[in-house]
Amino acid sequence: MKYFIPIMLLLLTSFTTRENADLVIYNAKIYTVSDKMDIAEAMAVKNGKILAIGRNSDIKSHFEAVSVIDLKGKAVFPGFIDSHCHFFKYACMTKAMSNLKGSLSFSEVLKLLKVYHEKYRPTWLCGRGWDQNEWKPKNFPDNIELDKLYPHKPVMLIRVDGHAVLVNSEAIRRAGITEKNIKNPNEAIYNTKGQFTGVFLESAADVFKDLVPQQDRQHQQTLLLEAEKECFSMGLTSLGDAGLDKGSVLLLDSLLVTGALKMRINVMLDPTEENFKTFVAKGPVHKDRITIRSIKVYADGALGSRGACMLESYQDQPGNKGIMDVSVEKLRSICKLAYDHGFQVCTHAIGDSANRMVLKTYSEFLKGKNDLRWRIEHAQVVAKADVPLFGMYSIIPSVQATHATSDMYWVNERLGPLRSKDAYAYHELMMQNAWIPNGTDFPIEEINPLFTFYAAVSRQDQKGFPRGGFQPENALSREQALRSITIWAAKAAFEENAKGSLEAGKLADFVVLDSDIMTIPLSNVPQVKVFMTYSGGEAVFIR
């Protein structure tokens, strides 16, 4: 790491008078995240881009600006990038539901639901965030109590991972699903009499989500703006929004083009015929704040709901290997479409069976080293023999470090010691291509990218558990973790030439923190606060 880089503007020495800038910051510790990880003191910004970056004396002597800010030694970083999240669904679904996260029993879920119902009286009573792995015993709930409390109102409670729902009998009636006509019987949980308990997984769960009435456009816009404020307050300036339908993309596009929204969004399209005709057939779209060049596919479910597709049965449920959500033939057809039209494929794969299938299917098209940057989202459990395929075919593992520290309490009983030892192998995966993008997968995890940074380096929860870290051999260094939420995250979306580092000519997306995450005790990182967030040289958050 080189401390205090020389000024980064080729013709700067030729100026005899000071050049106008919109913004100058100085007396800062600016982590540029350049190739050499240079550190600077000051930066000049104009028209949303970085004019120059270097020493205090150089920047102040060569530039004058309307806004000049003395940061008094505070640490500055490139705007944080969440490579994989669900921004639109968080805003327009989760924020419009009862928040069930952190509930320690089903009784607590019912209490939270009651408060929400009495306050809002919705036509559909919905909540999100329950996790039976946090309860004692760790069993899936059933809908008996829901039927007693809400016999005539449909209720849908989405599990924390989004891959399972608990619904009451009224919701099942409205969906028209019975034990005899359900398309995939493995996507429902049954009682000892062979009847639905109310828990549905994967595509069966999606049936209920689709029945919930959507907010009107104006309400959606309000919710999106609220969610954007949250993201800016966490230092996020760019997001990868994973899995959007046509209507959601068009709404985001209209709001971003008009400037109502300012977040930079990399769209991953749902693999629907409507999206293929509307977007993919016309080729990639690159605008100032929205990029459309990726297709999101689900290969399997999640570990928490035992939907992740495994090569062998779950340790705690013999005979159950999870659910494969897409056939090889279907994935192959999507890959061909993407390949032919210059689109990136981003496939959710958590179990080792799903990861193997995706890796092998990708390899049919990639044929060795390449720069197509096809991604596997999550890559949580990968068979040892399959790990080298990431490097062999330049396949990018897009991971979420907090998944490891959220799942570590129960993953051993779910997978057994051998498989769990090789799970969440982020350092090993990073080494395959020498870089790795990171994200949060919010609302499944918390939005805060500093939690991602902390989990990636410490492999611990915020209480310091376990001592020494969960599988610490797969921890990232602080520099690697920082790159994973900045320049490597930008690279995962083909945007490393525009953002992800603070260098002359790049977008002036940056965040100012109240402490230096690169030098403070690691245990203090989760308490660090964002002081200011800038997007395109504009202050979008000030504490």
Region locations from a protein language model:
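Short, charged, surface-exposed secondary-structure boundary motifs
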Residues: 79, 275-278, 407-411, 448, ...
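Acidic (Asp/Glu)-rich catalytic clusters
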Residues: 255-259, 281-290, 369, 390-392
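His/Asp/Glu-enriched, well-ordered alpha-helical/loop segment
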Residues: 335-346, 353-374, 378, 384-388, ...
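Substrate-binding cleft/loops of secretory-pathway carbohydrate-active enzymes
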Residues: 274-285, 399
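Bacterial Sec-dependent signal peptides at the C-terminal "C-region" and cleavage site
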Residues: 3, 8-21
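Non-cysteine beta-strand/loop elements that form the S-adenosyl-L-methionine
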Residues: 86, 290-307, 394-404
